[in-house]
């Protein structure tokens, strides 16, 4: 439980730095959790079928058959406990979704205005003054702890982690810098070019030759396409490496792009991660969950 609460709060926080990234992650994850909860809530169906309409000639005490009921539908399979757990989750996720949606208007407002107007002047202004409110650590910790609470208290922590696949990838990619194997600057956000209004991968410079362990790690990551290295043309010594975050990785693989485009790529990745999570949870649960399908 401690590890889940720590990861969920920091997983969103370290995948940040561009306007709209933090709140869009929270919105997509909360929608995924809400949809998962709705699968377990029954419809209050109470059908009554008169026997004479069925043409039954058998002797039966009751003149009608009741089908359905409060606890007889949904994936809870009649379990009132499961229904109450996912209702508890909804009590947190629905207000959280409302708060994040309202905040998105101010954090991504100029981008929405850009989408509506589609003018070059608006594009430049949006790049230079992209938001009227910033989430900071507060929103990241609020949303992350809300997810941890519903995952732990409603007993679907494994399913919750599946909705954090981009955050898990970002954490694993960041591990060499987070644990000191590669130098980690204070800020690893993409670098903004004021002349082209494009974002480029930010880099970490090596003033001294990196150790053999660091060089080997960076060479492996470069071979996998996860970072881009700048080497001395004569000695082959590593001079720079792009910071190890998923945002910089997008820029390495897809090239420089505007902040708006980068947020859309992150949003699409988060949505794809949620779709893949549902495939694993309800399509491959027997292989992945090992009998415990919470």
Where are these regions (language model features)?
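Function-critical hydrophobic alpha-helical transmembrane segments in multi-pass membrane proteins
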Residues: 2-22
